[in-house]
Amino acid sequence: MRSPLARPGASPRAPDLRDVEALVRERGLSLGLPLHVEAEAGSTNDLAKSAARDGAPHGSVWLAESQTAGRGRQGRVWSSPRGENLLFSVLLRPGGAMPLARLPELSLVVGLAVRDAAAKAVGDAAGRLRVKWPNDVVALEGDALAGATDGARPRWRKLAGVLLESQITGSGARAKVDALIVGVGLNVHTRSFPGELGSTATSLALLRAAGAPAEELSRAAVLVDVLEGLHRDVAFVAERGLGLVHARLTAADALRGQRVLAEGPTACPTAYPSACPTWEGTCEGIDLEGKLLVRGDDGVLRRVSSGEVHLGSSGSR
């Protein structure tokens, strides 16, 4: 039965999405089938959550050409022109009763998979595509890429956002992750963004390097590259942690070495968050539990597990 969250009638498959199933089978991936493509949906994450409750299998994917209620972290709206980009959700069933403590680590792994697929699509030999904790994918610009040392904050544009939502069984110490919904919004073909997005967003089409493959950007290829990254890393990290991917994550970390402004209760260095809405420090990387390491101006190193971390009023959020 079709979810009431979707509009009647699956989307006629766009030319650059026709090969998804064939590529998934060709690469022997555990993710990507079945694939549900909708012309329009409220939110692909909502479709996936509803289906997960009804027993949909691990690896199922929901993709929409347009969303009317797309959202990102902290309830932000994610907008995208119809038929230009990738708006999809993947249902993961980690198995083995994955503990809740692994969720921050898996969030980073998803961001890394999206970054790696995007870098392949645009021929990013210079390493300008980075993961901004906890899982946004951004493209460094100008002096930021060259490693400017004049004290200016780096500049980047957002390429992709990730939203993870989980379904939990048990409670307290017995709580485990039964299903994990991975929602991704990745700008592919869009070349013009409205309003303030014109100065803060980018797309694969805009980033494509001169040395990139000559063929047209294929959303199918990019999607399957993301799925391949998740196929490679998710099960391992769910069971054993970030260990083997930590070096790759460190190399792609957009915040490491930067002055950052932290907001939120777990980013506050006092026992009274209401008295400390923001604080500043220098990011020293990401630890093996997926927490951001920030050394405050008082010299104390703190591990940030949630909240908002950005570069302050003069930098990119």
Give residue spans per PLM region.
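Short, low-complexity Ser/Thr-rich regulatory SLiMs
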Residues: 141, 163-170
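Residue-level signal for inorganic ion chemistry
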Residues: 44, 88, 114, 136, ...
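Structured surface patches comprising rigid loops and adjacent beta-strands/short helices at the edges
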Residues: 289-291, 297-317
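Short, acidic (Asp/Glu-rich) active-site segment that either coordinates a divalent metal cofactor
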Residues: 171-208
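Short, conserved beta-turn/loop elements at beta-strand boundaries and strand-helix junctions
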Residues: 167-168, 191, 286-292
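Short beta-strand-centered aromatic/proline hotspots
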Residues: 279-286
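Conserved, helical-rich catalytic subdomain that frames metal- and/or nucleotide-binding sites
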Residues: 209-279, 315-317
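N-terminal lobe of the biotin/lipoate ligase/transferase fold
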Residues: 1-123, 142-161, 270-271, 314-317
